[in-house]
């Protein structure tokens, strides 16, 4: 059972603004978590979401275990992501 990855409009725009090499790393990491996301992501403190670390970048997401969806909310450099 694999999860479907859905990008928010904001996350898709943020991904497209990154360098091609970084885009590839993030997409490769997202493909890896489709089978068992809990093994790769960290729960955010005080927030219902999760984060995935990809080098200096963070991917903020929400995981719907019933519908098997991973909603990518935000993608940004670690110094800007939590602002």
Each PLM stretch: what is its role?
Residues 45-46, 61-63:
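Juxtamembrane/interface motifs at transmembrane-helix termini
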Residues 28-53:
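A short, surface-exposed loop/turn module that caps and links secondary-structure elements
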Residues 1-5, 9-24, 35, 54, ...:
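Enriched for short, Lys/Arg-rich terminal
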């Amino acid at each position: 059972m694999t999860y479907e990855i859905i990008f928010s409009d904001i996350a898709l725009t943020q991904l497209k603004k990154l360098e091609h090499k970084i885009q590839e790393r993030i997409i490769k990491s997202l493909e890896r978590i489709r089978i068992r996301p809990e093994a790769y992501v960290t729960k955010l403190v005080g927030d219902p979401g999760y984060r995935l670390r990809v080098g200096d970048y963070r991917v903020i997401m929400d995981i719907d275990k019933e519908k098997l969806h991973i909603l990518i909310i935000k993608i940004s450099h670690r110094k800007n992501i939590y602002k």
